[in-house]
Amino acid sequence: MKRMFQFRFLLPAGALLLAMGAAIPARAQAPAPEDLSRGVARIGLMDGEVSVRRGDSGEWVAGVINAPLMTDDRVATGQNSRAEVQFDSANVLRIGGNAEIHLAVLENGRYHIEIARGTVTYRIVRQSQADIELNTPSVSARPAHEGVFRISVTEAAESEITARAGDVEVFTPQGTQWIYAGQTMMARGSASDPEFQIVNATPEDDWDRWNQGRDRALQNNNSAQYVPPGVAGTEDLDAGGTWIYVAPYGYVWRPTGVAAGWAPYRNGRWVWVNWYGWTWVSADSWGWAPYHYGRWFFDARWGWAWYPGGLGVRASWSPALVGFFGYGGGGVGVGFGFGNVGWVPLAPFERLNPWWGAAYAGGLNRGMSITNVNVTALYRNARVSNGITGMAAGDFTAGRFAGVQRVSGAQVQTAGAISGRLPLNPSIASRRFSDRAVTNVPRASANTQFYSRSGAAAGSRPAGNSPAQPGYHRFGEPGAPSQNARPAQTQPGNTVGQRQGSLQRFGEPGSSQNAPRSGWRNFGTPGSSSGGRQPYNPPQSRPSGSGSGSSAPRSAPASRPASRPAPKGDKGHK
């Protein structure tokens, strides 16, 4: 028989009163509807120096693979470094060296990214309904469908947008302009009234070829066929384990190459993330999907296996899928009467008691209940010889995870199962993804102004603007050169990447930021052919097992105008 709330150690008065009124564990809850708008991306790959500026604390921390990213986070890379940010199973952003991006809006299916400097490539791998904005200091770009879109922003805040595959619509307060596959738009000036010209696409280089290799890894994803819709990070599972059939669950995934005594939720650390609270950051190379979706179980033949859930229901992301409890003595002042905190992975169909969201925000013990139980009787995986993990509660909150260890069933025969918000306050160290010191803190870019299609003030071009520099044109000026018709196909062997007039590429030796350049104009002017170009040929790859490989880029409708005035409801800058 359960003994409800018989603490052997003194609780803070407020916690004790709350606990006495909540002796029965809360019924399992699904995340509140507003939780689903709190999108989470991840660092899926990194090489070199990668730093993250936490939007909740403002601190720069060292990036790690599988680090969760949220709205207002920034990602910066050092010299000769690169990173990949994965938003879902279809949308990824790759960041080159000496670059910085800001996740201005990150909700489920809504990704607005500001590119402060450097070169990035946004890749839509397969069909996606996501609302995507790629904002630069001058313009806002919105991809139309699957494709490959390269964007560079120079130190002088000039922008270069290249459609390698697919089409992208570019927005300004004065109107919009299409960039078709095989074209590059060069834009400069303030977000209120930028200038641009369209030229042949920049030639492919090592950055593009590296991106093509990453595309193949995403497209040749055998694991995608075994997981429900909405699960990201499955491409990492192919190299990290195998899929096996285990009744009654069906196909499940088991990791290979793990150390003896390995268990889920042991190789990594707990990090405090805004809104979601304590979030598991795995040090396993494949450790995104199996720790934020589905359940784990232990099979006598195969060992630990991950059950991704039913294929017919779209999966929702969770910061972790475990049961928390306190155990052992010495917990005075910790906040819940125990000296240690433990956790166990939830088994298939076991209920999840969320500790995050609006219901549990705003106070140390708000929405919390603790029940004295035998943990091995409460959780199936607690009966596995190495299923329980624990550590000192003080080390947990201080971000010291070297002491994480296996916990025996005998140690938790009398423990306090926690339901609701965890009574463990984060420290500054709790917001860091690793013990590594950050080595790349970029110059301040928080004051850089970006144009956003969705968040800027309606308005036409301000009166009294100064005339364009010699050789430049502004959007809407009579007689501006027209450049935005879909370019004609070129035959193999034609020269590609040639700039029109005397224009040089951004950053080319000898180019002058102030020198007059021909061909610049303003949004809203009529379009005509921009000359020859070489079409982009996406890398060939076999379809994934789920049949969700990338489709060929679609052409824009013939009736779609190359440019049009700004739609009503466009708002000003931010």
Predicted regions and their residues:
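Low-complexity, repeat-rich tail regions
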Residues: M186-K574
